[in-house]
């Protein structure tokens, strides 16, 4: 008998009919002789609606109280789903994050899981019950409810799978697996049968919406057997694993687009040691991640440094740098929020010459200008104007998945 952890996102549990469908999937898995732990997200737009309600009451509500409020969305999902499963004649129990033993740090709204006390879940499984767990939440050392931030339910599911030594962790979404690009916006996108942890991590980090990078990092660390599939189609999904059979044949596994990007340029910096350190240490102290970096040296012993941050961090980054203008000594600061990042990812890229050239040629042929470039062993990213982003993804995808024929 296998132990299977299943996770269902907000779109999968959005209304009564979809909840019944999720209950059917869970009970069918259980009837095959498996133990089942299912992690559920809040229904549809529930979390956004709760945030709006909070803003009406107090736009400056504390993060602790926001976590108390937002955690209720997932609790509604698990209790309704449990009622549905009960009505089908199965034994089931729903558990909030704290009841499931999900222990976190005290970073309200962005908590990290420290460990999981699995005794309660195991006790319920031993009673042959289906266990439903509220995703996205836990409890800290002060017995306060915390939420895990973006991707929290994915992370909850993978963490539970690791702690329970589950045989499989299935992530159910509204698409039936991991595609070479977003099938909702890119013509010709193909589903992948399998993908490596490293490739999935890069795609998740570069804007692919299927899995959150935190959950992929955890799955890789604990070697969790991971599968992404649709709660609607019933078709086989995509397996995410350490090594895939098709790796030697594959140059590029996917093309991702990220519009949550802003470009910041510091112009007229002194060309001397320590300047870059000063800039990026200031941002790091405030938790602002920097991605693509470009430095250019002028003829007048000055230099310019350009870099990208999340668009949501751009205003804060601009404020921090302007406050330290005298210490950093720059002539001008420019912020451009009308940009997007296009990335190609593939484990086979490192050993195949010409991949970057092919990407750049595709963009050139489409008349798209490249503003910045970043490369690693399995990823190439370029910054383009936001208005060109959709065309850029389509052009690059068309070139690779006809040129190399890989999927």
Task: Tell me the role of every PLM-derived stretch.
Residues 1-216, 384-385, 404:
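Nucleotide/pyrophosphate-binding catalytic subdomain
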Residues 34, 90, 224, 288, ...:
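Short phosphate-binding/catalytic loops that engage adenosine nucleotides
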Residues 41, 231, 295:
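Conserved H-loop
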Residues 168-172, 226-228, 291, 372:
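Short hydrophobic alpha-helical runs that function as membrane-insertion/retention elements
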Residues 211, 222, 233-239, 314:
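Surface-exposed amphipathic alpha-helical tracts and adjacent flexible/coil segments at the periphery
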Residues 219:
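Acidic-aromatic/histidine active-site loop/patch
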Residues 224-235, 259:
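Active-site C-terminal subdomain of aminotransferase-like
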Residues 237-407:
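A conserved regulatory-domain signal marking ACT and ACT-like small-molecule sensing domains
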């Amino acid at each position: 008998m296998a132990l299977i952890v299943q996770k269902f996102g907000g779109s999968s549990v959005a209304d009564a009919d979809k909840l019944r469908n999720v209950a059917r999937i869970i009970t069918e898995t259980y009837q095959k002789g498996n133990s089942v732990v299912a992690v559920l997200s809040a229904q549809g737009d529930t979390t956004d609606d709760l945030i709006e309600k909070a803003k009406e009451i107090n736009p400056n509500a504390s993060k602790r109280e926001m976590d108390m409020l937002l955690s209720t969305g997932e609790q509604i999902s698990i209790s309704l789903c449990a009622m549905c499963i009960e009505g089908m004649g199965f034994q089931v129990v729903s558990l909030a994050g704290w009841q499931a033993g999900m222990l976190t740090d005290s970073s309200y709204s962005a908590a990290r899981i420290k460990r999981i006390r699995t005794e309660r879940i195991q006790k319920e499984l031993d009673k042959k019950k289906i266990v439903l767990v509220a995703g996205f939440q836990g409890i800290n050392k002060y017995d306060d409810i915390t939420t895990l931030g973006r991707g929290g339910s994915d992370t909850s599911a993978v963490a539970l799978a690791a702690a329970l030594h589950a045989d499989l962790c299935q992530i159910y979404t509204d698409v039936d697996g991991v595609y070479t690009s977003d099938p909702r916006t890119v013509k010709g996108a193909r589903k992948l049968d399998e993908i490596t942890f490293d490739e999935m991590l890069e795609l998740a980090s570069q804007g692919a919406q299927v899995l959150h990078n935190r959950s992929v990092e955890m799955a890789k660390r604990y070697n969790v057997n991971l599968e992404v599939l649709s709660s609607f189609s019933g078709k086989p999904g995509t397996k995410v694993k350490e090594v895939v059979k098709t790796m030697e044949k594959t140059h590029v596994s996917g093309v991702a687009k990220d519009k949550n990007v802003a470009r910041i340029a510091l112009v007229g910096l002194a060309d001397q040691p320590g300047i870059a350190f000063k800039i990026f240490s200031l941002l790091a102290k405030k938790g602002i991640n920097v991605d693509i970096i470009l430095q250019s040296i002028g003829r007048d012993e000055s230099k310019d440094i350009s870099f990208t941050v999340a668009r949501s961090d751009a205003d804060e980054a601009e404020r921090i740098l302007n406050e330290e203008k005298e210490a950093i000594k720059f002539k001008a600061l420019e912020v451009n929020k009308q940009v997007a990042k296009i990335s190609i990812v593939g484990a086979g890229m490192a050993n195949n010459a010409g991949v970057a050239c092919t990407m750049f040629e595709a963009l050139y042929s489409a008349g798209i200008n490249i503003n910045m470039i970043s490369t690693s062993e399995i990823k190439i990213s370029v910054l383009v104007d936001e208005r060109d982003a959709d065309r850029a993804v389509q052009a690059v995808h068309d070139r690779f998945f006809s040129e190399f024929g890989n999927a």
